[in-house]
Amino acid sequence: MSLDIVILAAGQGTRMRSALPKVLHPVAGNSMLGHVIHSARQLQPQGIHVVIGHGAELVRERLAADDLNFVMQDKQLGTGHAVAQALPALTADTVLVLYGDVPLIEVETLQRLLAKASDQQLGLLTVTLEDPTGYGRIVRDEQGQVTAIVEHKDANDAQKAIKEGNTGILALPAARLADWMGRLSNNNAQGEYYLTDVIAMAVADGLVVATEQPHDPMEVQGANDRRQLSELERHYQLREGRRLMAQGVTLRDPARFDVRGEVTVGRDVLIDINVILEGKVVIEDDVQIGPNCVIKNTTLRKGAVVKANSHLEGAVMGEGSDAGPFARLRPGSVLDAKAHVGNFVELKNAHLGEGAKVGHLTYLGDAEIGARTNIGAGTITCNYDGANKFKTVMGEDVFIGSNNSLVAPVEIKAGATTAAGSTITQTVEAGDLAVARARQRNISGWKRPEKTKKS
């Protein structure tokens, strides 16, 4: 069975009180529409058609991809009208309708719904709620068969008492869709063309309406304002936390933990409070992450330790290495096994060999540091001349004294030592000691300046 997916994303979202189109508001670091597209792709459809309207150019710009077909809805005349705009592009056997502001929908739920769809059967996703205010109500006959959906504003008191609501997510036989779209009417309280009216048409045409429900009602929760957006955010984070804990991660407090990307984890991982994981993060077995850390697009090998208040982006920490507290690893930073980065150390495009140590108060940029090398406190690689970047290379077993300035391009060869306070501008040969500082001069009888007395 071939599949086309239509995602409705044309709404303005006036209750957001924002210049940003509603579907671009983020949940867990990705736009709501981005989450829906991600789920849609996992169903491997032959086409994904995104119906856009308000802020159309910005939506195109943010989400442009070869596998997306953007369809313009110039006037927002209802969900039925929106789907009708995509009709000319639909060629598959089945059409699945999704919503760009319903980001938590699970792929497994959609797969169950699609299994209900066929030439003679329409799949409808419903949800049972204690308070279904705002939802269209599912009307069933005495045999329990769905006969219609009545929108909340059009429902009478008896219909409003129904707890089963319409999510709007449908799996439809494409061969019948054009006919149903042509028969839609806007004779209702909203003056809009409701997609839900196809349910009654399908029943009249002899089709069965088969329903499915999500395991969690929050899967089908939309966001019309920022309060609802925050509820989606927190639910997503708790769901991701449960997923990671099921895979062997200890979260000190799942309510104080955020995932904003794709996270792969091993077993016996410990994550403390207020940790944010962004982008693609790989965490292997026995890793420990202290409180208040931000880790983005980074790989943490087995047994690595990230201490409190550290910020890592585009980095790789090797097996048994450690960083922090208050460490910053910028893109291109690589720590080999058992390398150590201490407090208030910043690395950028720097490679630390196995067992290398950078204890504290140091900046290393565009640097290659050999195994077992020790970098003293206050060391800085001077890698930028105002126009170009240059590299600093240190061999194995180098000892850099405290408060050194290493003016790149420069090489300090294996086993060399630099004295504290040195400014190194030339190659230091293997095993040599480099002393590059002014000789101390003491001035006897010197008197400190005195403050001028005010008249």
Curated annotation (Swiss-Prot):
Annotated family: In the N-terminal section; belongs to the N-acetylglucosamine-1-phosphate uridyltransferase family. In the C-terminal section; belongs to the transferase hexapeptide repeat family.
Residues that bind Mg(2+), according to the entry?
A: 101, 224
Residues binding acetyl-CoA, per UniProt = 377, 383-384, 402, 420, 437
Q: Where is this region: Pyrophosphorylase?
A: 1-226
Protein name as catalogued: Bifunctional protein GlmU
**Top EC class per UniProt?**
transferase
Annotated stretches, region: N-acetyltransferase: 248-455
Catalyzed reaction equations: alpha-D-glucosamine 1-phosphate + acetyl-CoA = N-acetyl-alpha-D-glucosamine 1-phosphate + CoA + H(+); N-acetyl-alpha-D-glucosamine 1-phosphate + UTP + H(+) = UDP-N-acetyl-alpha-D-glucosamine + diphosphate
EC number(s): the record gives: 2.7.7.23, 2.3.1.157
Subcellular localization is given as: Cytoplasm
Q: Does the keyword Repeat apply?
A: yes
The beginning of the lineage is: Bacteria, Pseudomonadati, Pseudomonadota, Gammaproteobacteria, Pseudomonadales
Q: Which Gene3D superfamilies match?
A: Hexapeptide repeat proteins, Spore Coat Polysaccharide Biosynthesis Protein SpsA, Chain A
Task: Sum up the protein's function in the record's words.
Answer: Catalyzes the last two sequential reactions in the de novo biosynthetic pathway for UDP-N-acetylglucosamine (UDP-GlcNAc). The C-terminal domain catalyzes the transfer of acetyl group from acetyl coenzyme A to glucosamine-1-phosphate (GlcN-1-P) to produce N-acetylglucosamine-1-phosphate (GlcNAc-1-P), which is converted into UDP-GlcNAc by the transfer of uridine 5-monophosphate (from uridine 5-triphosphate), a reaction catalyzed by the N-terminal domain.
Q: Which residues bind UDP-N-acetyl-alpha-D-glucosamine?
A: 8-11, 22, 73, 78-79, 99-101, 136, 151, 166, 224, 330, 348, 363, 374
Give GO terms for biological process: cell morphogenesis; cell wall organization; lipid A biosynthetic process; peptidoglycan biosynthetic process; regulation of cell shape; UDP-N-acetylglucosamine biosynthetic process
Which pathway does UniProt place it in? Answer: Nucleotide-sugar biosynthesis; UDP-N-acetyl-alpha-D-glucosamine biosynthesis; N-acetyl-alpha-D-glucosamine 1-phosphate from alpha-D-glucosamine 6-phosphate (route II): step 2/2; Nucleotide-sugar biosynthesis; UDP-N-acetyl-alpha-D-glucosamine biosynthesis; UDP-N-acetyl-alpha-D-glucosamine from N-acetyl-alpha-D-glucosamine 1-phosphate: step 1/1; Bacterial outer membrane biogenesis; LPS lipid A biosynthesis
Co-factor note (free text) = Binds 1 Mg(2+) ion per subunit.
Q: A Pfam family name for this chain?
A: Hexapep_2
Q: Which cofactor does it need?
A: Mg(2+)
- In this protein, the active site sits at 360 (proton acceptor)
| Superkingdom | Bacteria
UniProt keywords (A-Z) are:
Acyltransferase, Cell shape, Cell wall biogenesis/degradation, Cytoplasm, Magnesium, Metal-binding, Multifunctional enzyme, Nucleotidyltransferase, Peptidoglycan synthesis, Repeat, Transferase
CDD domains attached here? Answer: GT2_GlmU_N_bac (cd02540), LbH_GlmU_C (cd03353)
Q: Which residues form a coiled coil?
A: none
Q: Organism, per UniProt?
A: Pseudomonas putida (strain GB-1)
MF terms in GO: glucosamine-1-phosphate N-acetyltransferase activity; magnesium ion binding; UDP-N-acetylglucosamine diphosphorylase activity
